[in-house]
């Protein structure tokens, strides 16, 4: 793919795929399924309790379980997704808390490269903010990706560069000098305000994305602005990727986060509304946040009730809903997006 202009890409759908999960049965320990009980605590919610609003239909699982990865890839391909953006916390860590877990991410990436190929999916990377992230750690992450993955044919590339989405990198001192070190990586950055776009272009970003699952929180995540953003990006020869989410609910994980950040699924209507605006923006790509982020409650992966965790219109759907509600809905929405001329 050449040229970053929004009009010069085929229509593609990407999804963020959480890779930090481990289980005692598969890996000898848990990661990804636990969360701090409050913002300053080192006391964690751990299985069998799960800090999410529902639980996976297949139960808690490991990102190293090939059977699970095949099940996911088959489902993701079936609904029309083209690219998996693997969450990447560094080669030797597994999750946000920067837990030392040597080689964990590498195993997941290598398994996904093999399995995604079987299902005709491509791989990119989403690098979120994590504890103690700084210039040095991000430099190490990017060097590792550049040296070990950028030339692999299974990776999704734009202008022969591996796609990298970065969530909070602009807050890191001297980050532009880091971008310019890697000529085999295509950087798309999260932004909040209209004034960010020009500055990010000067910094070396070749694209922008909205990322946030909570609509209206910033100028960029206000869906009524997406047509304008798409126009601004096109004028600067930058790629714009609007981000859609089915909802956002951290009431059982980030319990200290303000209620104003929560977004009800409204029985699927919130998701429909975001997709409608994404399609109308005429961007060639849409990002789903997420396939399986259970901690943030943004998952479309099939979910079931368990104990006190029940379906309702805020966290999933009404009493007539089933576990595949958002898989079915996503397939229909992707079809509408790809058919629009």
Would you name each region that the model predicts?
Residues 2-341:
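Glycan-processing catalytic domains of CAZymes
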């Amino acid at each position: 793919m050449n040229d970053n202009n929004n009009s010069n890409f085929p229509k593609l759908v990407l999804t963020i795929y959480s890779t930090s999960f481990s289980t005692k049965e598969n890996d000898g320990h848990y990661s990804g399924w636990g969360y701090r009980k409050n913002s300053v605590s080192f006391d964690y919610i751990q299985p069998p309790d799960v800090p999410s609003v529902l639980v996976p239909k297949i139960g808690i699982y490991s990102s190293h379980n090939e059977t699970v990865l095949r099940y996911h890839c088959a489902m993701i391909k079936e609904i029309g997704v083209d690219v998996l953006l693997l969450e990447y916390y560094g080669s030797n860590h597994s999750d946000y808390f920067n837990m030392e877990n040597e080689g964990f991410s590498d195993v997941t990436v290598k398994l996904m490269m093999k399995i995604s190929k079987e299902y005709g999916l491509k791989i990119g990377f989403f690098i979120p903010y994590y504890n103690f992230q700084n210039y040095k750690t991000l430099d190490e992450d990017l060097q590792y990706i550049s040296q070990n993955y950028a030339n692999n044919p299974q990776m999704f590339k734009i202008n022969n560069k591996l796609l990298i989405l970065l969530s909070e990198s602009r807050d890191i001192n001297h980050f532009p000098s880091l971008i310019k070190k890697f000529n085999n990586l295509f950087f798309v950055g999260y932004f909040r305000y209209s004034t960010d776009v020009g500055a990010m272009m000067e910094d070396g970003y070749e694209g922008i994305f909205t990322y946030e699952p909570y609509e209206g929180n910033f100028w960029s995540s206000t869906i009524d602005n997406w047509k304008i953003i798409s126009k601004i990006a096109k004028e600067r020869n930058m790629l714009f990727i609007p981000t859609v989410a089915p909802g956002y609910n951290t009431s059982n994980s980030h319990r200290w986060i303000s209620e104003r950040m929560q977004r009800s699924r409204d029985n699927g209507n919130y998701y429909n509304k975001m997709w409608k605006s994404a399609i109308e923006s005429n961007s060639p790509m849409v990002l789903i946040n997420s396939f399986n982020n259970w901690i943030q409650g943004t998952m479309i992966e099939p979910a079931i009730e368990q104990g006190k965790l029940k379906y309702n219109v805020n966290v999933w759907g009404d009493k007539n809903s089933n576990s595949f509600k958002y898989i079915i809905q996503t397939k229909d929405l992707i079809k509408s997006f790809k058919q629009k001329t």
